[in-house]
Amino acid sequence: MDAGEVTRKSRPSKSKKKGGKGTQAISAEDEAKRREAVKEQLRQKLELERKARQVVERLLEDSVTEEFLMDCAWHITPANYKDTVEERSIAKLCGYPMCPNKLTNVPTQQYKISTKTNKVYDITERKCFCSNFCYKASKSFELQISKIPLWLRKEESPPEIKLMKQGDGGSSGQEIKLIDKPITEADIDNPIEDIPESNKDLIQGENGDIEQDFVSSVVSNQHKQVHWGKLPKRDEVSEDAAEYSHSEHEQRINGENKDESESSQTPQPQKDTTDHPALEKNASEIEGTLELLNQDKSTQQEGENTSSSQPESDISVPVAGDLNITQVGMSKRSAAGLKGLLKDHHKAKTASTAISQCLLERLRQAFIEWRTKETMIFLYGPDYASGMQLSTAGAWEEEQLDEDDLDEAEVGVRSAEGGPSRTSAPVPDVETLRKETEMLELRVREFYKGVCVLPEEVETAAVKETEHTQDSGKDPPLPLVDSHAQHQIQKRIVVEKLSHSLRDIVGPLRLTMSDVINDVNNLVRTFRFTNTNIIHKSPEWTLIAVVLLSVLTEVSPLLRESLASVSSLEYISCFMKELKLEDKDLHNLVLLFKPCVPIQT
């Protein structure tokens, strides 16, 4: 028994050893077959790639038929065809294989602007073709070439290739999109349908954010206005009131939904009698909410208290059908944002007003410093200076009148009595008369002798000798002193700035530069400039030009007639509005050049 058991146990071990050798032999055979299959696949790939290269070389020839090109599409890839186009362009042949033309006059730029289509094209690829048709035909053929690898096309069927015919049109290149086209309604796949007005309030109430505290106000549809309540303070009373109003609003919506569901199941024969109590209940709830919200407004003005208490009297006795109550809500965050926008608008308005006032004050100071006595003489003539002198002398006489009135009164009394009004000349001395007589006799004798020299001739000779001496010792001309040179530079700067601004003004005023430039130059020559009062910005120079043209109406009838026209007045008014100024501000600046304003020395 023991020997039999041993033999039985040994047999399976022998069989296992034989089975292991067979498995190893089978796996070796499979590995060899797999290697042969991989080698065969590699040979096929290499063969297909070699054939594709041959096709590419064949496409580089001058004469390629249509049938051959259509057959080649199944044996090459898009990359092979791009290599074909590039190689043909290097050989100065058209990139389209069916075109035997040579490439001449190849453009050097990268982009082309088409004036017919108002588009920009990238002509990098277009340079490889002789015409737009060849470029478009080549791109069309390239798009039809299959992108499947060559060694996987055995199970696929060759696609149908269609080549473009002559006259189908061409393409200038790849279009460059400078701007994106706006999205139209047709581009949207599933547009949202418009929600009826009757369902908008219900949807907004159901989808509202529970965490937002709403500040509500009750208005009447009859007035077509919405009055937003002021933002309440963050205290316990306002928060409780907001939470209370929000909870009441949710309960009201839930109650309405429940009533609608019940009404859909059971008939309502007494509809009019049930609507009235519900409306009264809603009005009472809204009234209680408003009373809680208005507790924080006790410190406001009397007018605001009156407006806040007005809704109570309006809704205290609601009548069904006569008054439609609408509840308008806005979150506290939105109310704070709206309040910030209003503050920013007010600040911007205040800042613009301050800037305008600063501009006017700066120009006013500059005009006062510019104006001189020569300016007034140029504008109003030399009579202005004499009139000012007479007025000054008269004022001085009036001041001295208080001191000299007694002396003048005494002189008047003496003249009335016949006394001398002035002291007589003194009586000449006898010795002086005798000497003068001797001198006259001596001059008469010398005159008859021919040696007389009159004093007038002596004085004339002395003057000529003095002039000759001065001419002989005259200094050479010297350049301007620094102060004068700076003044000339400042005048030139002002004239350039004014000329630049006048070019934009004379057109709307129906004038030309030749009509005003001479008067402007003459007026600028009379100004007194410094290194600070000629520094202005472009809008300021334009306003200065308008002021000077208004001032020059005193000397130029053409300017006076032009500025008095309706179109000129409208243009100047619009210009002042753009600068946030008024017409009276321009008038006040012009008045600075009137004689009534004293000249700064």
Curated annotation (Swiss-Prot):
It is an enzyme of class 3 (hydrolase). Residues 297-313 have a biased composition (Polar residues). Belongs to the RPAP2 family. GO terms for cellular component: cytoplasm; nucleus; transcription preinitiation complex. PROSITE patterns: ZF_RTR1. Residues 9-20 have a biased composition (Basic residues). One of its GO terms (biological process) is PERK-mediated unfolded protein response. A zinc finger (RTR1-type) spans 71-154. Transmembrane segments: none annotated. One of its GO terms (molecular function) is RNA polymerase II CTD heptapeptide repeat phosphatase activity. Zn(2+) binds at residues 94, 99, 130, 134. It comes from the Eukaryota. Protein phosphatase that displays CTD phosphatase activity and regulates transcription of snRNA genes. Recognizes and binds phosphorylated 'Ser-7' of the C-terminal heptapeptide repeat domain (CTD) of the largest RNA polymerase II subunit POLR2A, and mediates dephosphorylation of 'Ser-5' of the CTD, thereby promoting transcription of snRNA genes. Downstream of EIF2AK3/PERK, dephosphorylates ERN1, a sensor for the endoplasmic reticulum unfolded protein response (UPR), to abort failed ER-stress adaptation and trigger apoptosis. Pfam families: RPAP2_Rtr1 (PF04181). This is Putative RNA polymerase II subunit B1 CTD phosphatase rpap2. Associates with the RNA polymerase II complex. It catalyses: O-phospho-L-seryl-[protein] + H2O = L-seryl-[protein] + phosphate; O-phospho-L-threonyl-[protein] + H2O = L-threonyl-[protein] + phosphate. Residues 243-261 have a biased composition (Basic and acidic residues). Its EC number is 3.1.3.16. PANTHER family: RNA POLYMERASE II SUBUNIT B1 CTD PHOSPHATASE RPAP2-RELATED (PTHR14732:SF0). It is found in: Cytoplasm; Nucleus. Gene3D superfamilies: 1.25.40.820.
